[in-house]
Amino acid sequence: MANVIHVGINEAVLATRKTILKKAGHNVILARDLREVISACKAGSFDVGIIGQALPQMEKLRVSDTLRKHCTGIRILEFHDAIKPDLDTADVHLRVAETTPASFLDTVTQLASIRCKKGRASQ
């Protein structure tokens, strides 16, 4: 089970992805702007940060920087619509048109396991 923060602006997509993750046993917090990201990071720790495809590129960069600054050790997954990802600093990129619910869930689980292994090793 991973602690996941999903940042985006498309409510339907956020709700769908939250449902997929919660059914698999993950804890999920949704954030729609930087203020909510900072608040969530102060309230708890996250293994995986998901950045939605509907965010403009500059906003994705700000969100990524904020997650890295306020959620130490977080792994970032970027969803994108384009052929080339917007966010070079993400750990993983998923193209929306090529992603199934199962591949999304597998990717989050793999990222969380990397984060958890690193966290345990440093303790």
Show which residues each predicted segment covers.
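Two-component/phosphorelay signaling modules centered on CheY-like receiver
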Residues: 10-29
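Acidic, metal-coordinating helix/loop segments flanking the phosphotransfer/catalytic sites
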Residues: 30-48
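Short acidic active-site motifs
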Residues: 33-37, 59, 100
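Conserved N-terminal glycine/acidic-rich loop preference
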Residues: 34-35, 46, 54, 85-95
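Conserved phosphotransfer microenvironments
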Residues: 50-73, 80-81
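Output/docking surface of receiver
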Residues: 77-123
